[in-house]
């Protein structure tokens, strides 16, 4: 899946961090030799090869000696793989000797890639290709009692574990739409690596609004008023009107209830005889029109009437394709007869808003139907025989004529005005995964984010598309957002968290927040919300929940106290920390210090017993804190009291043997404490503090071995709780490494989780550390050179251990032969005149580096002078 710019650099040792994972690798030179002298820390166990036929498995024994951290881990045998994968592996092995780019996969991702290497038939037990989505978001229509309130809600289909019935539920949107704002400027962040927050956010009604005899294939909300919900199964289509009613009209902030009234019923046996429904699409501006598609390719446009509905237009995909091929130039496309009549293909139809027509597609062709007195059929796209079309998305596009295509090979950015001419193509290199899907989020007219995710393993990569001077560009590297690799995904929606600077919330404002909210419906039946951060930031953000009528329901605050300990600064810290309107109060070390170190007898001192007695009193002032997770120090020292005087909390912590915070938060390396004050300035040196040995300044007769393991664990729990609260995490149970992954997920835990969580510690070699120090997910860091300290290199071209580098590519502008023209609504050209003969130009592929003075453009030629 790697598309780093180094893929196109020849004769240079390189490495690919697939899926954007933070991992380690053993660097190799083009000859296949290890660059570093010590390779015992090599954690990469499997290699794969990206060729013109896709992602293939490489026979490791012929080229590389791969070591594993786990001595019991066994490499798979090629004979255990399907025959097709084995053949492609041998081809890749035989052709890989002349290549210099080697790719490796970490051991904790091997099982994921092994799934991608299987044939499509082996994935049928994991996913159902006929199910388009299992939940959707939409706005409810104001009722007569509540005319001025619109509320976003979620519709979700579930299968009952007891009765195996297919149920449809509704849920209010709160609290899964978040917005982010910077609360402090020019301050260091605590978490310097990407993180996400798990939030328990869904409360469904006990009773479903409908029961289906067959699994729900698609859920769609209409855009206009009234708000309609289309629920489609293989045999029936039910259309609901969804409203939200307040329980008490005089109190707008009181809870309300969702209601769904079925308006229309369509049965596949009535409209398509023995055929079944494939998908449904609602007109983007007029709710009275919608279209359906059958599994055999028949598509029909319907219109609502007061007494029912009527059929406006209908045809079959085969007839539409034949008319489109007749109108297309014969030299512009070459196709096979089996593509005209494919077996076991899936048909889809959807509205497009630019011309008010319909887009049809199967696995090989994409058509456009211009509706009028005489419908026009045009061919938009045709893929090669070894590529299949998986999905077409045109919703939420800022320019209505544009859409995205997901194929088994790449993601294509298309424009209806330019058939067969993609604006941009990005190869995802996941050809062997038939479960890929995309979701498109357009923040504003210049930024479009396409998320490609796998239903088999849950790995998500996000691609950023934009335009620079009307030319399509993509300057961001795909990065990992979610990584529940062990649980397949049924549906996924990713939304940005917007910035707000005032009480008014404008979705059309500029988008520069690194936060995203993702709703995931997993195969195990769970529905969860994740707040994700794509990269580290120098700002501190305040995440606020948005509801339909109210403002804030919860806050996640990150607080960095000032280094200055003056009274004025302390007062500022108190003001920042105080959040009286928040449901979740934040417990910070700075406020704890001011409470504990009260000026008694004009001495800023406190004994350990006083500290123990003050902690429970301070904790009880906060209703949101779970008292069960707090073990007070007074209970710990009842049988073993300590006498001592401490000037600040830092000294108390320094007297506690290693808290192992690095185990709980792998990326939280340290907090600096000043001798005169506990205020910390950075998170880069916590290791020097938490690994400090116990040095008793109190009673020399006290011996540390007297402490029992349970007492040490309780002390750690208290300190962990203080640190968790100081970085903006509250209302959680202390993470217990003895808990299983399932138990951890079931707890109400708000914490920073590293990608691909692994309880085993990883020891990184020198080359690996050099890579990871300057690398972030979602961002190609500045140009850096990683060399071998044991080898001196003067001439990279002649040296066996040449320098390894990655060139920064923030934005590469790839010109198109024909710039997309955006027409105004008043001056829309004739549709048929826009279709011209396809050009044979090479599609710009962003995984390639464009070199040369003029990039991919030809060099400028001097004009010939005419005249005398």
Swiss-Prot record:
A Pfam family of the record is Rrn6_K-rich
Q: Where in the cell is it found?
A: Cytoplasm; Nucleus
**One GO location term (cellular component):** nucleus
Q: What are the UniProt keywords, alphabetically?
A: Cytoplasm, Nucleus
Give start-end of the signal peptide.
Answer: none
What is a single molecular function from GO for this protein?
RNA polymerase I general transcription initiation factor binding
GO terms in the biological process aspect are: nucleolar large rRNA transcription by RNA polymerase I; transcription initiation at RNA polymerase I promoter
Q: What is its main location?
A: cytoplasm
Checking PANTHER family in the record gives: RNA POLYMERASE I-SPECIFIC TRANSCRIPTION INITIATION FACTOR RRN6
Protein's name according to its UniProt entry: Uncharacterized protein C3B8.11
């Amino acid at each position: 899946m790697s598309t780093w710019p180094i893929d196109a650099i020849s004769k240079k040792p390189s490495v690919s961090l697939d899926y954007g994972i933070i991992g380690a690798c053993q660097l190799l030179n083009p000859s296949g030799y290890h660059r570093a002298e010590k390779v015992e820390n090599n954690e990469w166990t499997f290699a794969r090869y990206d060729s013109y036929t896709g992602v293939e498995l490489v026979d490791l024994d012929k080229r590389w000696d791969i070591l594993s951290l786990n001595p019991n881990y066994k490499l798979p045998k090629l004979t255990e793989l399907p025959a097709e994968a084995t053949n492609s592996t041998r081809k890749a092995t035989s052709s890989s000797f002349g290549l210099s780019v080697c790719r490796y996969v970490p051991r904790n991702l091997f099982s994921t890639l092994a799934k991608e290497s299987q044939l499509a038939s082996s994935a049928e037990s994991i996913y159902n290709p006929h199910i388009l989505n299992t939940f959707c978001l939409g706005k409810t229509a104001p009722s007569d009692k509540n005319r001025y309130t619109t509320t976003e809600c979620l519709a979700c289909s579930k299968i009952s574990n007891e009765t195996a019935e297919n149920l449809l539920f509704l849920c209010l949107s709160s609290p899964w739409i978040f917005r982010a704002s910077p609360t402090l400027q020019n301050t260091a962040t605590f978490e310097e690596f990407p993180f996400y927050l798990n939030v328990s956010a869904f409360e469904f009604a006990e009773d479903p609004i409908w029961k289906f005899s067959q699994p729900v294939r698609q859920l769609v909300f209409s855009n206009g008023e009234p708000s309609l919900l289309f629920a489609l199964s293989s045999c029936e289509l039910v259309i609901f009107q969804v409203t939200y009613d307040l329980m008490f009209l005089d109190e707008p902030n009181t809870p309300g209830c969702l209601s769904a009234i079925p308006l229309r019923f369509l049965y596949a046996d009535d409209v398509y005889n023995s055929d079944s429904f494939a998908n449904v699409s609602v007109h983007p501006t007029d709710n009275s029109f919608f279209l359906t598609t059958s599994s055999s390719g028949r598509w029909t446009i319907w219109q609502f009437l007061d007494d029912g509905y009527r059929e406006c237009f209908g045809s079959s995909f085969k007839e539409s394709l034949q008319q489109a091929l007749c109108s297309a130039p014969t030299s512009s496309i070459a196709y096979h007869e089996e593509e005209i009549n494919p077996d076991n293909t899936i048909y889809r139809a959807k509205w497009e808003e630019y011309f008010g027509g319909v887009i049809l597609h199967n696995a090989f062709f994409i058509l456009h139907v211009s509706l009028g007195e005489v419908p026009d059929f045009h061919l938009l796209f045709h893929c090669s025989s070894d590529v299949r079309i998986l999905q077409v998305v045109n919703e939420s596009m800022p320019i209505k004529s544009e859409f995205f295509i997901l194929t088994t090979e790449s993601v294509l950015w298309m424009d209806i005005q330019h058939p067969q001419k993609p604006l941009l193509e990005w190869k995802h290199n996941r050809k062997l995964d038939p479960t890929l899907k995309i979701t498109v989020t357009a923040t504003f007219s210049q930024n479009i984010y396409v998320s490609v995710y796998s239903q088999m393993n849950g790995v998500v990569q996000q691609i950023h598309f934009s335009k620079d001077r009307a030319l399509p560009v993509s300057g961001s590297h795909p990065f990992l957002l979610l990584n529940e690799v062990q649980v397949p995904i049924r549906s996924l929606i990713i939304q940005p968290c917007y910035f707000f600077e005032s009480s008014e919330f404008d979705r059309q404002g500029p988008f520069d927040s690194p936060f995203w909210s993702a709703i995931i419906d997993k195969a195990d039946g769970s529905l969860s919300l994740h707040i994700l951060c794509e990269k580290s930031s120098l700002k501190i953000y305040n995440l606020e929940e948005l509801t339909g009528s109210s403002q804030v329901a919860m806050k996640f605050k990150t607080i960095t106290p000032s280094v200055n300990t003056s009274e004025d600064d302390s007062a500022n810290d108190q003001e920042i920390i105080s959040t009286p309107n928040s449901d979740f109060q934040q417990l910070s070390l700075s406020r704890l210090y001011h409470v504990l170190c009260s000026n008694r007898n004009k001495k800023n001192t406190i004994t350990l017993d006083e500290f123990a007695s003050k902690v429970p009193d301070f904790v009880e002032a906060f209703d949101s804190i779970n008292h069960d997770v707090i073990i007070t120090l007074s209970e710990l020292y009842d049988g073993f009291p300590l006498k001592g005087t401490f000037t600040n909390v830092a000294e108390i912590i320094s007297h506690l043997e290693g808290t192992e915070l690095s185990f709980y938060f792998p990326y939280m390396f340290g907090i600096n404490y000043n001798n005169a004050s506990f205020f910390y300035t950075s998170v880069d040196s916590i290791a020097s503090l938490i690994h400090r040995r116990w040095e008793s300044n109190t009673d020399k007769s006290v011996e540390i071995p007297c402490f029992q393991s349970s007492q040490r664990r309780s002390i750690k729990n208290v300190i962990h709780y203080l640190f968790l609260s100081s970085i903006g995490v509250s209302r959680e149970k202390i993470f217990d490494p003895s808990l299983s992954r399932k138990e951890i997920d079931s707890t109400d835990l708000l914490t920073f989780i590293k990608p691909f969580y692994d309880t085993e510690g990883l020891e990184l070699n020198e080359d690996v550390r050099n890579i990871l120090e300057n690398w972030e997910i979602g961002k190609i860091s500045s140009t850096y050179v990683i060399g071998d300290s044991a080898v001196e290199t003067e001439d990279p071209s002649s040296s066996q251990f040449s320098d390894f580098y990655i060139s920064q590519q923030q934005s590469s502008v790839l010109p198109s032969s024909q710039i997309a023209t955006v027409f105004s609504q008043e001056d829309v050209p004739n549709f048929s005149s826009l279709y011209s003969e396809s050009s044979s130009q090479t599609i710009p592929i962003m995984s390639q580096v464009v070199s040369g003075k003029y990039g991919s453009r030809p060099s400028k030629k001097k004009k010939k002078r005419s005249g005398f």
